[in-house]
């Protein structure tokens, strides 16, 4: 899956799937993990309504790739556990995504 960052608003990116379909996503936040040596990006659909339950997606990314970098799938259960802990902490501190 590739990432194409919208130059007008750095909080929105377009993901292009293997079939060429484009979907807009808002960036919830990014963070780095020294333990796993990766940077992570957490996204949710740009068309999600404020009162909807939102499907948050997480990927590994390389911030040095710029606007057209490739997002990588998180394959390790240990990495997923860490990402979920970071997300839960973010949501608890932020009071949700409101």
UniProtKB/Swiss-Prot annotation:
Specify the domain of life of the species encoding this protein. Answer: Bacteria
Q: Where are the transmembrane segments?
A: none
- Which Pfam families does the UniProt entry name for this protein? DUF1292 (PF06949)
Family in the record: Belongs to the UPF0473 family.
Record's PANTHER family?
UPF0473 PROTEIN CBO2561/CLC_2432, UPF0473 PROTEIN CBO2561_CLC_2432
Q: What is this protein called?
A: UPF0473 protein lp_2273
User: What species does this protein belong to?
Assistant: Lactiplantibacillus plantarum (strain ATCC BAA-793 / NCIMB 8826 / WCFS1)
């Amino acid at each position: 899956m590739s990432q194409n960052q919208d130059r007008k608003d750095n909080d929105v990116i377009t993901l292009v799937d293997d079939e060429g379909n484009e979907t807009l996503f808002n960036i919830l936040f990014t963070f780095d993990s020294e333990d796993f040596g990766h940077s992570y990006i957490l996204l949710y659909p740009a068309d999600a309504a404020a009162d909807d339950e939102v499907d948050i997606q997480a990927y590994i990314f390389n911030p040095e790739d710029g606007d057209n970098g490739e997002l990588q799938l998180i394959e390790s259960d240990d990495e997923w556990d860490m990402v979920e802990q970071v997300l839960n902490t973010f949501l608890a501190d932020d009071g949700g995504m409101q």
